[in-house]
């Protein structure tokens, strides 16, 4: 009985205040009457404190410390990557960038609901300069292309100058051929004969009393084009028509000498060369060549009027 009483003592301390509340009295057992007792927990009869609940009792023996919070660091700009000697600390942006890589499929999750590849554009915060030590080849290619541009432009300008020289020579041949064919008459030269074939046939058989010189002109001559007037054009046409009438009668005295310069500047040089053509004619002295340098505006007007007036010799006679 002593052992049973000792074992019942801790049970009484846990579930009740007194032994009478926890179990029946020995007198009741002897009399055969069972008496029900109400079991009251210890934590209901205790005041507020550390032993009020089982959770607080466990928490007092096993204290739970708060977990450490995640620290986010700002990413440095690409310009400051080489200025700092300390290594960069990896952040969540690195993980996002790795998950966005197409080759590294192991970093993806099944719940990844990222949009399509051609629509997805990573934000500047997610884009990491992982290969910052690798040189940027695109920038070098652009720099080399910019350095090659002047050389390409020079080559193009030289090609354009060659084409302009060919055009200049063709224009000079056309003007010279028209003047030769109109001066010698329609009976002496057929209409369908090539211009290049007519020049060597009729050129050396006459004395050189007229010369057309094509040369380069400076930029100062361009300003003279705006000063051209209609009155000078009319006067030049009348004087040319009178000279052409005497030219038709004296066929033995006519000749033509064409010379070209070797260097040509640009497209405006075509007009400059025509302006600078030197027309020297002195019908009073037949065997002498007197070179006259006239205004470029008057020269081009005279050459054009000579071209169109010589084509119609009948109109020249009627006008006089």
Curated annotation (Swiss-Prot):
Paired cysteines (S-S): none
Stretches with biased composition (Basic and acidic residues): 9-30
Lipid bilayer topology: Peripheral membrane protein
Example GO BP: aerobic respiration
Region (Disordered) residue spans: 1-37
GO-annotated cellular components: mitochondrial outer membrane; mitochondrion
Described purpose of this protein according to its UniProt entry: Mitochondrial protein required for adaptation of miochondrial dynamics to metabolic changes. Regulates mitochondrial morphology at steady state and mediates AMPK-dependent stress-induced mitochondrial fragmentation via the control of OPA1 levels.
Family in the record: Belongs to the MTFR1 family.
Stated name of the protein: Mitochondrial fission regulator 1-like-B
UniProt organism field: Xenopus laevis
Gene name per UniProt: mtfr1l-b
């Amino acid at each position: 009985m002593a052992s049973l009483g000792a074992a019942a003592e801790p049970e009484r301390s846990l579930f009740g205040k007194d032994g009478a509340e926890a179990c029946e009295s020995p007198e009741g057992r002897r009399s055969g009457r069972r008496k029900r007792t109400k079991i009251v927990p210890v934590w209901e009869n205790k005041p507020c404190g550390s032993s009020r609940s089982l959770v607080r009792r466990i928490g007092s023996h096993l204290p739970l410390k708060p977990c450490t919070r995640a620290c986010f660091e700002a990413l440095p700009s690409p310009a400051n990557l080489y200025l700092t000697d300390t290594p960069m600390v990896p952040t969540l942006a690195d993980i996002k960038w790795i998950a966005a890589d197409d080759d590294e499929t192991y970093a993806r999750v099944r719940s990844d609901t990222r949009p399509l590849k051609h629509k997805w554009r990573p934000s500047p915060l997610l884009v990491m300069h992982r290969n910052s030590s690798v040189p940027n080849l695109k920038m070098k290619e652009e720099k080399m292309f910019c350095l090659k541009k002047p050389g390409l432009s020079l080559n193009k300008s030289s090609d354009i100058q060659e084409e302009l020289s060919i055009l200049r020579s063709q224009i000079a041949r056309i003007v010279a051929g028209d003047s030769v064919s109109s001066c010698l008459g329609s009976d002496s030269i057929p209409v369908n004969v090539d211009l290049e074939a007519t020049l060597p046939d009729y050129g050396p058989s006459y004395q050189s009393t007229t010369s057309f010189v094509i040369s380069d002109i400076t930029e100062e001559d361009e300003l003279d084009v705006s000063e051209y007037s209609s009155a000078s054009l009319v006067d030049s046409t009348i004087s040319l028509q009178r000279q052409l009438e005497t030219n038709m009668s004296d066929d033995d005295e006519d000749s033509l000498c064409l010379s070209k310069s070797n260097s040509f500047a640009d497209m405006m040089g075509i007009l400059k060369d025509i302006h600078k053509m030197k027309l020297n004619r002195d019908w009073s002295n037949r065997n002498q060549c007197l070179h006259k340098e006239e205004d470029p505006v008057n020269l081009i007007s005279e050459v054009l009027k000579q071209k169109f007036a010589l084509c119609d010799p009948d109109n020249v006679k009627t006008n006089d």
